[in-house]
Design a protein with these regions (language model features):
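Short amphipathic alpha-helix
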Residues: 15-26
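Glycosyltransferases and closely related glycan-assembly transferases
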Residues: 3, 49-54, 84-99, 107-122, ...
Length: 184
C-alpha cells in the first residue's frame, strides 16, 4: 500500500489557506492526501468536496483555549477520544507523515502522529507568535517551518501556483491593499 500524507489544521482561513497550498503541492506530485479538520469552523466549507483528497474527515472538535475549567476538561477528553480515532485511521491508510498547520482542528491528528511509532510530524506556523497547539507539539516534531524563526529550514509562506499564473505587471500602481487576519 502506498504512503498517504495527512494534512491537518484549520478553524480559520489563515490556517486553511496554508493547508490548501500543501494539499495542492502533494496532489500535483501524485501523493495521496487525507485532510483531517473539524466539523466546527470553516474546514468543511473548504475541503468537504475537494477532489484532490483521498479522504476528508471532519471531527467534532473544539478549542481548549478560552474555556472555563469544566469546559477545558470536556475539550481535552474529546481530543483524547478523537486522537484514538486518528490512530486507527493512520494504521488503515499507512500514514507515516503528518503536516499540521495548527488551529484547534489539528489537535487530535497532531497528537496521534506523536503517538504513532514511525510517523513524522511537520508543523507549519504561519503566525509571528506560535499558537498553543504548535508550541506544545513542536518539541515532538521532525521539523517546524516558520517565516518568523531564523532557525527554520523553510521560511517561505506556501502560496498557490495560481497566484503566479494570474499575476500581471502593471505600469503604474495606484493602490495597494493588504487583507488578512485569523479569520482569513
Amino acid at each position: 500500500m502506498n504512503e498517504t500524507v495527512v494534512v491537518t489544521g484549520g478553524g480559520t482561513g489563515g490556517h486553511l489557506k496554508v493547508a490548501d497550498a500543501f494539499i495542492e503541492e502533494f496532489y500535483n506530485r501524485g501523493i495521496s492526501v487525507i485532510f483531517i479538520g473539524s466539523s466546527n469552523g470553516q474546514d468543511k466549507a473548504w475541503f468537504e468536496n475537494d477532489k484532490r483528497l483521498e479522504k476528508a474527515i471532519f471531527l467534532d472538535t473544539r478549542g481548549v483555549v478560552n474555556k472555563k475549567s469544566f469546559g477545558k476538561v470536556l475539550s481535552l477528553l474529546n481530543i483524547f477520544s478523537k486522537t484514538m480515532q486518528c490512530l486507527k485511521l493512520y494504521s488503515k491508510y499507512n500514514v507515516k507523515t503528518v503536516i499540521s498547520v495548527g488551529g484547534f482542528s489539528a489537535a487530535a491528528a497532531t497528537f496521534a502522529s506523536i503517538l504513532k511509532f514511525g510517523c513524522k510530524l511537520y508543523i507549519h506556523e504561519q503566525n509571528s507568535k506560535m499558537g498553543k497547539l504548535n508550541e506544545i507539539t513542536s518539541k515532538f516534531a521532525t521539523d517546524v517551518f516558520s517565516s518568523f524563526d531564523e532557525n527554520s529550514l523553510v521560511k517561505d509562506y506556501p502560496v498557490a501556483k495560481e497566484f503566479f499564473n494570474t499575476a500581471r505587471v502593471r505600469d503604474k500602481i495606484k493602490t495597494i491593499a493588504f487583507f488578512g487576519g485569523s479569520q482569513g
